[in-house]
UniProtKB/Swiss-Prot annotation:
Residues 616-627 have a biased composition (Polar residues). Residues 81-100, 599-629 are annotated as: Disordered. It is found in: Plastid, Chloroplast; Plastid, Chloroplast thylakoid membrane; Plastid, Chloroplast stroma, Chloroplast nucleoid; Nucleus. Interacts with MAF1. Interacts with PTST2; the interaction is essential for the initiation of starch granules biosynthesis in leaf chloroplasts, for the correct location of the process in the stromal spaces between the thylakoid membranes, and for the association of PTST2 with the thylakoid membranes. Residues 604-615 have a biased composition (Basic and acidic residues). Its main location: plastid. It comes from Solanum lycopersicum (Tomato). This is MAR-binding filament-like protein 1.
């Protein structure tokens, strides 16, 4: 591509290009970097000038590749100029001036290439400059880090050297101290040699003292064992007394709970009694109401009886009217039969009238009479129908009255059933009240028994409390005496310990004096060391024994303080027990008063119960009478119902007969109408013939 595009290039052109691009490379954008790299660049130019020419050629080729799209753009612009030559003369002039000034197209191309290459190289140079700046910054940071590490390494060296020096000094000091300690140990050995002989004699004396102390310790141990046994006995006695007190407290709590339960039961019984009184009052009210209702029912029954009598009378009158109606119906039926016979006769006469037209005039008179008779029959039928409608109205009224009476009787029966139920409820409530009163009496008897038992138990508890008080006071006196003895023994043991300590101090002083006077016994050091260790062990054992004795004494003192505290607590508990007993006595007195009140209430309740029994017996008698009256009324009502049913049957029969009569009347009317139509036609024919005869005349 490069050879085809640029064939005439030679060394002169390459020199021109190099002369044109040198100022671009020598632009003062990064003078420091150029200064740093001047010797490197000089060496490179001096070594290989051919490589620089090759680089220039390569740069020209790259610029040519980058300019190719610009040439295409210029060709497109020239095509646009050929199309718009008439509209843009000024642009052509400018192009001509540019072509005239250029003279040679290769020079213009080179200028364009130089401009484009300068832009590309400038951008590449800027990128390289930024990369160099970043690399310089990283190098400087690395140099700073290296300097810091070197400083840290130097400081570590100095610290290590100082530590080594200090360790050497410490080792020297330790060596000196060890030498001094060795010398001190040698001196101690020398002094120990002098003290060993004196220790032998002192050990013998100390053994004697230790044996004496052992005998004294054994005696003290025996005394301590005796005191421990006495203390155990006292503790057992205290436990027994505490158990007794707990048992008494439990009994007291049980008694208090029982008393509270009895109080609650008394309250509940009183509330139940109040409820029963209210129930009795309500029952008395119900009884009075039932009496009033019975009076009202008796009055209503009387009224019903009067109404029944009235209705019976009305029914008798209605039966009479029904008999009259039956008679009238029979008469109407007879008249109907006669009218039927007359109709048959009229039909026969009509047939004869047809056969005998000459006898029409005579038949007209008979027809008029028959018509009059028919009108009379129609009037009679109308009256019969009106009477039948009246009878129907009466029957409907009677049925309504019958239904009303049935409703009244049903309501009365419901009221009677309700009264029976109320009476049964009252009887059940009275029986329940009786059973509850009997239960209350049983409970009161139980309460009396419990109160007597409580009084007995309270008296027993008082006796037991007095005995426990006496025994506790004895135990307290014994514990006081034993504590005083223990305190005296403790004082004696403390004095003995002080004496032994003083003797030990004197012996130690004498041992020091003997150790200063005797320095010639070096050969017996080993034996003396053994003896000294043995004596040390014995002394340690004696010290441990003394410490145990002191600890036991402290423990005894603490036990004495505890026993004092227990004594105080027992005294407080005794005071509380006495207070609780006083409260129990008060509660017992209050319960006795409440029992007396309950007995009085029971007596009053029994009186009231007897009164209620009498009232209930009276109510039963009244209810029996009311039941008998109700049964009588029920029997009367049943009789009335049967009579009503018979009347209803009769009314139904009358209705059926009336319906049959209506049907027959309608048939008669239809027959009469059928007879009237041909008669009227014949009359019209006769009238027409008469008119014709008159016209002919």
């Amino acid at each position: 591509m490069a050879t085809s595009c640029f064939p005439p290039f030679s060394a002169s052109s390459s020199s021109l290009c190099s002369s044109q691009f040198t100022p671009l490379l020598s632009c003062p954008r990064n003078t420091q970097i150029c200064r740093k790299k001047r010797p490197v660049m000089a060496s490179m130019h001096s070594e290989n000038q051919k490589e620089s020419n090759v680089c220039n050629r390569r740069s020209i080729l790259f610029v040519g590749f980058s300019v190719l799209p610009l040439l295409n753009l210029r060709a497109r612009a020239l095509e646009g100029l050929s199309t718009d030559s008439q509209a843009q003369p000024q642009k052509e002039e400018t192009e001509q001036t540019i072509q005239g000034s250029a003279g040679n197209p290769f020079v213009s191309l080179l200028n364009g290439l130089g401009v484009v290459g300068s832009g590309v190289l400038g951008s590449l140079y800027a990128l390289a400059r930024n990369e160099k700046a970043v690399s310089d910054a990283t190098i400087e940071s690395m140099k700073n880090k290296l300097k810091d590490k070197e400083d840290a390494f130097v400081s570590m060296k100095k610290q290590f050297e100082s530590e080594l020096l200090s360790e050497r000094e410490d080792r020297n000091k330790l060596i000196r101290r060890e030498g001094e300690e060795r010398q001190a140990l040698v001196n101690q050995l020398k002094s120990a040699k002098t003290t060993v002989i004196s220790l032998g004699q002192e050990l013998q004396n100390e053994k004697k003292l230790a044996e004496d102390l052992k005998f004294e310790i054994k005696g003290l141990q025996n005394d301590l064992m005796n005191t421990k046994e006495d203390k155990k006995k006292l503790q057992e006695e205290l436990k027994e007394k505490l158990d007794l007190i707990q048992v008494l407290e439990e009994k007291i709590t049980l008694l208090t709970t029982e008393i509270k339960d009895k109080e609650v039961s008394l309250r509940s019984n009183t509330s139940k009694l109040a409820e029963k009184e209210s129930e009795v009052n309500s029952l008395s009210d119900m009884y009075q109401q039932s009496q009033d209702q019975l009076m009202n029912l008796t009055s209503e029954i009387k009224e019903l009886k009067d109404e029944i009598q009235k209705r019976e009378r009305e029914l008798e009158l209605k039966c009479v009217s029904e008999d009259n109606l039956n008679v009238q119906l029979n008469s109407l039926l007879l008249e109907r039969d006669e009218s039927k016979k007359e109709l048959h006769a009229i039909q026969k006469e009509y047939s004869e009238f047809k056969s005998n037209s000459d006898e029409k005039v005579a038949s007209d008179a008979t027809l008029g009479e028959q018509e009059k008779r028919l009108h009379q029959l129609e009037e009679q039928l109308g009256t019969a129908l009106s009477e039948a409608s009246k009878n129907e109205v009466l029957i409907a009224d009677l049925t309504r009255e019958k239904e009303n009476l049935r409703r009244m009787v049903d309501a009365e029966l419901d009221n009677v059933n309700k009264l029976k139920q109320e009476i049964e409820v009252t009887q059940e409530s009275l029986e329940n009240s009786r059973s509850e009163v009997s239960d209350i009496t049983v409970q009161l008897e139980q309460l009396r028994d419990l109160s007597s038992k409580l009084e007995r138990e309270v008296s027993k508890l008082q006796m037991e409390l007095e005995e426990t008080r006496a025994s506790l006071q004895r135990n307290i006196d014994e514990t006081k005496h034993s504590s005083e003895l223990l305190a005296a023994e403790l004082t004696t043991t403390k004095e003995l310990l002080k004496k032994t300590n003083e003797e030990m101090h004197t012996m130690s002083d004498e041992l020091v004096a003997v150790s200063e006077n005797r320095d010639s016994l070096q050969t017996e050091l080993v034996n003396v060391y053994k003896k000294r260790e043995h004596t040390r062990n014995e002394l340690k054992q004696e010290k441990t024994i003394v410490r145990t004795l002191e600890e036991e004494l402290k423990f005894l003192e603490s036990q004495i303080t505890r026993e004092k505290e227990l004594r105080k607590s027992l005294e407080d508990e005794l005071e509380k027990a006495t207070e609780s007993l006083d409260e129990i006595n008060r509660n017992v007195l209050a319960l006795a008063e409440e029992l007396e009140l309950a007995t009085s209430r029971n007596s009053s309740l029994e009186d009231e119960r007897e009164v209620h029994r009498q009232s209930v017996s009276e109510q039963k008698q009244i209810s029996q009478e009311a039941q008998e009256n109700l049964e009588d009324a029920h029997s009367l009502v049943m009789k009335l119902g049967k009579e009503r049913e018979s009347l209803e049957k009769r009314a139904k029969k009358l209705e059926d007969e009336m319906a049959a009569a209506k049907g027959e009347i309608l048939r008669l009317r239809s027959q009469i109408n059928s007879v009237k139509a041909p008669v009227e036609d014949e009359e019209k024919v006769v009238a027409g013939e008469k008119e014709k005869v008159n016209v002919q005349q």
